[in-house]
UniProtKB/Swiss-Prot annotation:
Coiled-coil intervals: 814-859
Chain positions covered by the region annotation Disordered: 130-153, 464-503, 679-717, 775-806, 820-984
Keywords, ordered alphabetically: Coiled coil, Growth regulation, mRNA processing, Nucleus, RNA-binding, RNA-mediated gene silencing
Protein name from the UniProt record: G patch domain-containing protein TGH homolog
Function noted in UniProt: Functions as a component of microRNA (miRNA) and small interfering RNA (siRNA) biogenesis. May assist Dicer-like (DCL) proteins to efficiently process and/or recruit the precursors of miRNAs and siRNAs.
SURP motif repeats: 408-450
Principal location class: nucleus
InterPro entries assigned: DUF1604 (IPR011666), G_patch_dom (IPR000467), Surp (IPR000061), SWAP/Surp_sf (IPR035967)
Statement: the UniProt record of this protein carries the keyword Nucleus: yes
SUPFAM superfamilies per record: Surp module (SWAP domain)
Subcellular location, record wording: Nucleus
Organism: Oryza sativa subsp. japonica
Length: 984
């Protein structure tokens, strides 16, 4: 297909459109019906192939489809043939073939795959292969070729010869000939000829004539069949086929191909061995046939073999002259002679043995095994490998006479053996300038240096070996070996064995030896004063120290060093438990090297409370013990906080049960989680609180002492963790509670119970209040406190409980002072109503001085709080915010009582203000500043708002008290006016 020059650069994309005349009519019809077929419903559409023919499903004997959809033309589709059979018309057996399920195209495709015989399976080549070979040879003769002669069969005929044909051809078979043994025919012919000769010699004349006639006839018959046998018998059978393969050479290999003389020699030797073997085995009996004789009249060539046809099988009689048997010598005797000496003739025909041989047989003795030889191989370590592969030990050489040279050689050898070869190289470099080291360069003392170097190297290797030698697998691991492996130090035992029948002196000596072997622990060298928990009871303290000795000190000891016969078993067991607890506390106190004085003070307080009660306040702080102890496992009871149980809406499992004082587990635990009673006692003792009713001078002294001890108090006060819920929901009246006195006894069990009760009541009130606010309900008013009831009249247990609840908010000593000063002011304000008019001015002056002192103390405390840490400031700010929130709520809720009581309070405040105003105008010492009046007014309001939540008093009683107080105030005013009028 050619293109023009202009169209050479064009590229054709896509499939070219066929011409209409090239397509068949069926294809044109399929293209035309393609658009119509898409518009038909699914069940009417027919599947067609690329030629436009309907697709044929080859699943049945007929039909294009096998179902309802896309059927041949009926709704049912293909219908199978009905089975009919009768007597006249029997049902025929239909034989199905593969052509019943194929269409025309499939049959056309399979038409060329018929089964036929091929030349590949023509095993014997009688027909196809032979014909092809002959045809190829004829064609080769007719046409000229560059290769002269016939073409080999491997180039013309394909390789269709099977392996069986190849093997037969190797064995002597040829194409077109029968497979039979030609040697059997020759054997038969030889026997027949021998029979003829025997009859001719032993028969009569007539018989001989008949035999000649018969032989003549038989010769004719043989001549007739000879030509046939020559045609069908093998005439060119190889020699190696007659002789079976009995050597180790390859198939068809002849080692004597180019040396026929060696081949003849070998054949003669083999025939001689066979003859000797047959003579020994067959000539011993008289009844056996004379098979070893040869038939007379037959000559044997020099190079011919003695075959079966040469035997005289028809000979009669026995060979008596050959009865002597030559017995071959034994094999052992023949083996003793040398083979070369036994052969007088040459081994081969063309060789001769020399008269004198230079060959001498030499025998070598086996090597001698040394006595220290071990058949098992021992693998050496890298260091041993290097040392053992070195040269052997040098011989011993006497030391040089020069002492300085000998010392120098020994020192140099020791240094080289320890440090390595580089030290020797360094000394060799030094020998170039210093003649003393000439022994390193084959000088005087070289042999002695080599010997000493080897000795030091061996000594160094021996030192590097481990001390413990591995025992054999059969040895058992004893206690001593185990102790050595683990690095344990054995106890020093005395030479004499211990026995119960020792005299007294030997027993004392044994005990002293044991006491010297055991070292006393550091804790027993002398207990410090603060680590003697039973020092108030000397007998018990002595028993405790003996308990520590028995626990930590070994050796022999008497059964009862301290008599305890007066104690019962229960008391003795309880005392032992106390001793163990005390010893454990002392050990825990020695975990760290240093401990600050406050932690030692708290630890001593805990020990005193746990074992023996004591009122001593000053503790001696000894030096810290540096004994290291191992960690111990402890079990303690964890109790959830009541507020935690409330938040999770569960019942407190420990409700009403006293708190158990836990042992401090570390230094921080002893600081923070110290017993409340001990902390409160220390605070009370160090705060130096002034009494309730003090004079102006006494108050001044108390203020000076408090200012002097402020730094110490701040250093000893520890901020406990702030509970957020308690800081928010605790009552504001807790800040106004007073601490119990220092001289009152404290019961820790009762204190914990009261603290739980107060805390639960406060939490419940706060919860109800918050719930009422959320539901939009009014909060019920709290019951007021009588005006003549003071907080100092509370019981010690209640005060302790309130103190514990306040301690949970980390109250410092400065806050305690402020609360007490506020209480003093409230007492003065309450007592001013009952004071006569003559002492009003004195009380006012006293009140103003206390106010001034409280203001100064508050300013100092605020200044210290600004300098304190972030944690304290945050906790204090949270407390102030919670107090302001509660105060605002109380102002909104108002004072419980009727509206008349509120008006009564207001009138009372106005009267008190007018009274103070009058007193200020008459007092020469009064301060006329408005700020003091404002502060006093707020303080009085706080006093009126303060009430005790635990007091049970009805509203009626509250109103009556206020009415009586108002009547008393009116009477006092009238009496005061009378006195003024009288003075005038």
């Amino acid at each position: 297909m050619g293109f023009d020059d202009d169209d050479e650069d064009l590229v054709v994309y896509g499939t070219p459109i066929e011409r209409e005349e090239d397509t068949s009519a069926r294809k044109r019809r399929a293209v035309a019906e393609a658009g119509q077929l898409r518009a038909l419903p699914a069940w009417k559409q027919e599947v067609r192939d690329e030629e436009g023919r309907r697709r044929f499903h080859g699943a049945f004997t007929g039909g294009f489809s096998a179902g309802y959809y896309n059927t041949v033309g009926t709704k049912e589709g293909w219908t199978p043939q009905t089975f009919t059979s009768s007597r006249k018309n029997r049902a025929e057996m239909k034989k199905q073939s593969i052509y019943s399920f194929l269409d025309e195209e499939d049959i056309k495709d399979m038409g060329g795959n018929a089964l036929e015989t091929s030349q590949q399976y023509d095993t014997f080549g009688f027909t196809a292969t032979e014909h092809a070979r002959k045809q190829a040879s004829k064609e080769q003769k007719e046409r000229p070729s560059a290769i002269p002669g016939p073409i080999p069969d491997e180039l013309v005929v394909p390789a269709t010869t099977s392996i069986g044909v190849k093997l037969l051809m190797k064995m002597g078979w040829r194409q077109g000939r029968s497979i039979r043994d030609a040697h059997a025919d020759s054997l038969y012919e030889s026997r027949r000829e021998a029979r003829k000769a025997f009859l001719a010699l032993s028969g009569t004349k007539t018989g001989g004539q008949k035999i000649q006639v018969d032989s003549h006839k038989s010769d004719k018959d043989d001549g007739a069949t000879e030509s046939f046998e020559e045609l069908h018998a093998s005439g060119n059978t190889p020699v190696y086929v007659l002789h079976p393969k009995q050597d180790l050479h390859g198939l068809g290999f002849d080692p004597f191909k180019h040396a026929p003389e060696f081949k003849d020699r070998k054949r003669l030797q083999k025939s001689a061995r066979d003859r000797n073997r047959s003579d020994v085995s067959m000539r011993g009996s008289l009844l056996i046939s004379n098979s070893g004789q040869y038939a007379p009249g037959f000559g044997i060539g020099a190079l011919e073999e003695l075959g079966v046809e040469d035997e005289d099988i028809y000979a009669s009689g026995f060979a008596y002259e050959q009865m002597e048997v030559d017995i071959e010598p034994s094999k052992t005797a023949s083996d003793s002679n040398y083979k070369l000496e036994d052969r007088k003739r040459g081994v081969f025909l063309a060789f001769k043995i020399a008269s004198s041989s230079e060959y001498k047989l030499e025998r070598f003795d086996p090597p001698e095994i040394p006595s220290d030889f071990d058949g098992r191989h021992k693998f050496l370590t890298p260091r041993q490998d290097v040392n053992n592969l070195s040269d052997l030990a040098p011989p011993e050489v006497p030391a040089p006479e020069d002492t300085s040279l000998r010392l120098l050689i020994e020192g140099c050898a020791a240094m080289v053996a320890r440090c390595g070869k580089h030290i020797e190289d360094f000394y060799k470099e030094k020998s170039k300038t210093n003649t003393q080291f000439n022994f390193l360069n084959e000088g005087d003392g070289c042999s002695y240096y080599a010997r000493k170097l080897w000795e030091y190297q061996q000594k160094y290797i021996d030192q590097q070996k481990p001390d413990t030698v591995q025992s054999k697998s059969s040895d058992k691991l004893t206690a001593e070996n185990r102790g050595k492996i683990l690095g344990e130090r054995p106890l020093d035992r005395s030479t004499k064995s211990s026995s119960s029948s020792f005299p007294a002196k030997e027993a004392i000596q044994l005990q002293s030896n044991l006491a010297d072997n055991f070292v006393k622990p550091i804790s027993l060298d002398g207990l410090p004063e603060y680590e003697k928990p039973f020092r108030n009871d000397p007998a018990k303290q002595a028993r405790f120290e003996q308990f520590l000795k028995d626990k930590y000190q070994g050796g022999l000891r008497p059964a009862n060093l301290i008599p305890t016969s007066t104690m019962s078993d229960v008391d003795r067991a309880r005392e032992r438990l106390d001793f163990e607890a005390a010893a454990e506390t002392i050990e825990k106190g020695k975990e760290k090297k240093a401990m600050d004085p406050l932690s030692l003070l708290g630890l001593s307080g805990i020990n005193e409370q746990r074992f023996v009660s004591s009122t001593e306040s000053e503790r001696s702080i000894p030096a810290r013990d540096e004994k290291s102890i191992y960690p111990r496992r402890e079990e303690f009871e964890w109790r959830p906080s009541p507020i935690l149980c409330k938040r999770f809406d569960i019942v407190d499992p420990f409700m009403g049960k006293p708190f158990h004082v836990q042992r401090p587990r570390s230094k921080m635990d002893s600081l923070i989680f110290m017993s409340e009673s001990t902390t409160r006692t220390n605070e009370v003792e160090s705060s130096s609180i002034a009494p309730q009713h003090t004079s102006v001078a006494g108050a001044t002294e108390t203020e000076a002492k408090g200012a002097a001890t402020d730094p110490e108090i701040e250093s000893s006060s520890v901020q406990r963790p702030v509970d957020l819920y308690k800081a928010i929901f605790s009552d504001d009246s807790d800040d106004d509670m007073a601490e119990p006195l220092a001289n009152q006894p404290v019961d820790p069990v009762k204190t914990s119970e009261d603290a739980n009760m107060v805390l639960n009541r406060l939490v419940a009130e706060d919860f109800l209040e918050s719930l009422g606010k959320e539901l939009g309900l009014d909060v019920p008013p709290e019951k007021p406190t009588p005006p003549n009831v003071l907080f100092r009249s509370e019981t010690p247990s209640t005060a302790n409980a309130i103190g514990i609840s306040r301690n949970r908010k980390a109250i410092t000593c400065q806050e305690i002072k402020e609360n007490e000063s506020a209480l003093d002011k409230e007492e003065i304000a309450n007592a001013s109503a009952d004071v006569p008019s003559d002492n009003v001015e004195e009380l006012g002056l006293k009140y103003e001085k206390q106010e001034h002192r409280a203001e100064k103390s508050r300013s100092r405390s605020s200044h210290r709080q600004t300098q304190s840490g972030s944690l304290d400031s945050d906790s204090t700010s949270d407390q102030h915010r919670s107090r302001e929130r509660r105060s605002r709520h109380k102002i909104r809720s108002g004072t419980p009582g009727s509206d008349s009581s509120i008006e009564h309070h207001r009138s009372k405040k106005r009267k008190s203000h007018s009274k103070h105003r009058t007193r200020r105008s008459r007092s020469p010492y009064a301060d006329s500043s408005d700020s003091q009046y404002t502060k006093r007014k707020h303080r009085e309001k706080r006093h009126h708002r303060t009430r005790n939540p635990d007091t049970d008093s009805s509203d009626h009683e509250y109103e009556e008290r206020h009415k009586s107080s108002s009547r008393r105030s009116s009477d006092k005013d009238r009496s005061r006016r009378r006195s003024r009028h009288h003075k005038r």
